[in-house]
Amino acid sequence: MKNLIFCCFVLLSVIPASAQSLVKVDYSVDKCATIKQLDAVLRSPEGEPNKQGLLILHHGGGFSLNTTQQYGEFFAKQGFVTLELKMFNEHKDTPDPTTLHAFAMGGLKYLSKLPGVDPKRVSAMGMSLGAFLTVDSASTWFYDQYQGGDLRFHKLAALYPVCWLMTEAAKGQPQGIRPFTGLPSSFLQKWEGIPLLILAAGKDSYDSQDSTACGNFVQNINDTKQAQVTKVEVFENTTHGWDHGKNYSFLVRGGCTGRTNCTNITVYSPTAVDKGKQSVLSFLKAQ
């Protein structure tokens, strides 16, 4: 019995612990502001390391809904160092847009300094609200406002962004749109030419179930190079929040097409989740 216990102890001792840790990420809303910190989950590569970092930005429901874990685990197994920001826990605690964008820059700077990560190969992906931050991270304003210096995201993947909102911003008309409150009207008028993949929900309630909404956004990008490196993949018959793990609906005030009200319907789709993972992986691995 003693030998059995000893063998079990030895076996357990060589099983690696989960390759994740809770870390603190520095951020600042501008060059004169005090440096603050937010929590994040850092995952080390479980597969062959590929020297790439991936920042994962959750949706407006908050980190507590645990949507980012599935992506952190998946991409860590593909050799990425992943960082899931805890931007806020619940929707009612959502910070202002200026702070949210500062979080994204903080994540870029954190990953770029890690040993084993090529600072030129740090990418970002986000869902819904996180997708807005991801798209905005292709703008020149983002790097100027948050002192990015020579740092740039390598690639960007936006999952089910609300594209009528992005189209308004691309036109220089973000007024009255909550995710853009406090941002200059010109914040999406100049671009960095960073490859951007948009995975659009063909039945997104926010976009009036218009499967062409994200294509329309790309057509309104006023920079030829950025438009050329922005690709849209539409998941037909798929709703906003396809990766939330449950079905639900709620009233949206002023956030639907043309600043109108609507009922957002979310239907969980494991098929779309798997398809999305593979699409983003192929995008990030492509030369």
Regions found by a protein language model. Give the residues of each.
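Short beta-strand/loop motif that positions the catalytic acidic residue
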Residues: 198-200
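Short substrate-entry loop that stabilizes the transition state in hydrolases
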Residues: 48-52, 57-94, 165-166, 205-210
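Short alpha-helix in the alpha/beta-hydrolase fold that links the catalytic acid
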Residues: 208-221
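Catalytic nucleophile-loop/oxyanion-hole region of alpha/beta-hydrolase
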Residues: 87-109, 113, 118
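N-terminal cap/lid segment of alpha/beta-hydrolase-fold proteins
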Residues: 20-49
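Primarily recognizes the serine-hydrolase "nucleophile elbow" in alpha/beta-hydrolase
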Residues: 66, 106-193
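Short beta-strand-to-loop junctions in surface cap/lid or active-site-entrance loops
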Residues: 39-50, 115, 184-189
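C-terminal catalytic histidine-bearing segment of alpha/beta-hydrolase fold enzymes
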Residues: 227-287
